[in-house]
Each structure stands twice: as C-alpha cells, then as structure tokens.
Amino acid sequence: MAVRPEAIAALPVDQVMGRDRACKEPLLLGEQLFWAEHRPDQGGRTTLMRQVAAGAAPQDLTPGRWSLRSRVHEFGGGLFCASSELAVFIEARSGIPHAVSFSPGAQPRPLISGPSDECGRYADGLIDTQRQRWLGVRETTSCDQLVALPLSGGEPQVLRQE
C-alpha cells in the first residue's frame, strides 16, 4: 500500500535530528534533585545536574569538557550517584568514577589513578557515607566485580567477583 504524501505529518527538524535535551536517571536525595541531562547542542555530552530545592535554579556539576557515560557490557549502566556532600559520576572519556563536591567552583577529580584501559569499566555505583567509599560494578576483560573505591581516591578493593 502506497503512502500518500499528504498523510505524512510534518515533524520539526529538532525532533527528527534529536537536538532536544533529554533528562534521565532522576535521583531525589532529601530536597535535592539530581539528573543526567543529554545535550546534543553541546557536542552530545551528558552533564550532571543538581537542583537544591523546588524552584531553585539548577546547577551544572560537570560543566565544560566533562561528560557522563558508562560502557559496562557495551550498553552502559548507572551514570552517577550522590550523597549530601558530593556526587560520583562515570566520566565518558576515561570510563572511571570521578567525584565532585558541591562547594562553589569545585572541579571533578578521579577516584582512581592510572590508565583507564588497565582500570576496567565502571557503572551502577552508590556512596557508602559511613565508610567514605564508592561501591559499584567493575567490568574487566576476564570478569565482573563488585568493588569499593575510597572517596579520597585510591586502588579498588574487590568485594565480590563473578
């Protein structure tokens, strides 16, 4: 059956080309709302946003060159987690967790030192505030692991391996 041209609805170019910003992975922590925001108008990067209270202006926690992305199992996984003092996100280029505090002007810092290809791929984290560590999934070339990383930075501690 042929489709008549007059039966095809006109779609806005931005919708067809995927140029609209998209929000994903909302997280509510007390009165604070966090989300990952995909920005096609900024080279396709995904940024971490925080709104401290209803009606307050949102804050970009990963401005400029920073972008969130996980490549665990090629499909990715959870991009970020947060506590009352900081957020941890998976940085797109390195694939490793980075922490950023909520202090004005704070810059993200890696939780692991060393080349990312030796560190594995990370995702699906949470912050253990009592022990001051990030817990998450690490995929290596040989297995999947549940690991802990000190929030101050350091080497991963393997908690479980499959």
Where does each model-flagged region fall?
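Beta-strand C-termini and the immediately following turn/loop, strongest in propeller blades
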Residues: 30, 35-41, 51-52, 81-94, ...
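Conserved beta-propeller blade repeats
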Residues: 18-32, 67-87, 116-134
